[in-house]
Amino acid sequence: MVKLVFARHGESEWNKANLFTGWADVDLSEKGTQQAIDAGKLIKEAGIAFDLAFTSVLKRAIKTTNLALEYSDQLWVPVEKSWRLNERHYGGLTGKNKAEAAEQFGDEQVHIWRRSYDVLPPDMAKDDEHSAHTDRRYAHLDHSVIPDAENLKVTLERALPFWEDKIAPALVDGKNVFVGAHGNSIRALVKHIKQLSDDEIMNVEIPNFPPLVFEFDDKLNLTAEYYLGGE
C-alpha cells in the first residue's frame, strides 16, 4: 500500500487579503507558515515516510514543502520542482480583490470564472508585472505553452503529463510521494485520480490545511482517502 500526500500551500499573503493569486509568486503569511509546520508534525505523527517529493515553482508551495518535510524529519527527501504543478493561472483577475471583482463583473460571472470547469477568465496582458512571459523561471518554455489564463480543464491538461511521467510511476514503483502544490492544481489531479465528472469537481475544495492522503494498491487503484488529523 503506497501513500500520496497532497499538501496545499499554507495561507498566502494574498489569500489573507482575498486576492486572486494564480501564478503570482506570493509568500506565505505567518498563519500559512504555521500551517506548513503543523502539516509536517501531522505527517510525523502519522508515521508517513516519503521517498520523494514534488512541488511547483512558486515560493508558497516550495516553502510549504520544505517546512512539511523539515518538521516531519524528512528534509533530506529529494524534491523536484515543476511549473506543471503551479496554481491555475487566473489571467486578468490576478491581483484583483475577489469582492471588488464581483462588484465590477457581477457575482454570477465571477462565480462562473472561479468554479466552472471550462470557462476561461480574461487573459492577462503580456506586459503585466506578473506575466510569466518575462519571468526567468519559465525561460526554458516555449511561449506558446505559457498561459495567459486558465480554467480547471486547462490546468488539468497542464498537470496531467507530470502525473503520468513522474507521480504515477513513482507510486507504481512502491514509493510514498509528497506533493506540495495549490488548490486548483490539486483539484485537477483529484478529478483525474477519482474520475470525477466536470460537475462533481466544482464542489470539491482543497483547504490550506491539513494534508490530504490517498492510498493506492500496487495497480494504482485508490483504496483510501482521508485528511491527516481526522478532518
From Swiss-Prot:
Its EC number is 5.4.2.11. Disulfide bonds: none annotated. Substrate binds at residues 8-15, 21-22, 60, 87-90, 98, 114-115, 183-184. InterPro entries: His_Pase_superF_clade-1, His_PPase_superfam, Phosphogly_mut1. The active site is at H9 (tele-phosphohistidine intermediate), E87 (proton donor/acceptor). Keywords: Gluconeogenesis, Glycolysis, Isomerase. The record marks H182 as: Transition state stabilizer. GO terms for biological process: gluconeogenesis; glycolytic process. GO terms for molecular function: phosphoglycerate mutase activity. It catalyses: (2R)-2-phosphoglycerate = (2R)-3-phosphoglycerate. Catalyzes the interconversion of 2-phosphoglycerate and 3-phosphoglycerate. Belongs to the phosphoglycerate mutase family. BPG-dependent PGAM subfamily. This is 2,3-bisphosphoglycerate-dependent phosphoglycerate mutase. It comes from Streptococcus equi subsp. zooepidemicus (strain MGCS10565). The lineage of its organism: Bacteria, Bacillati, Bacillota, Bacilli, Lactobacillales.
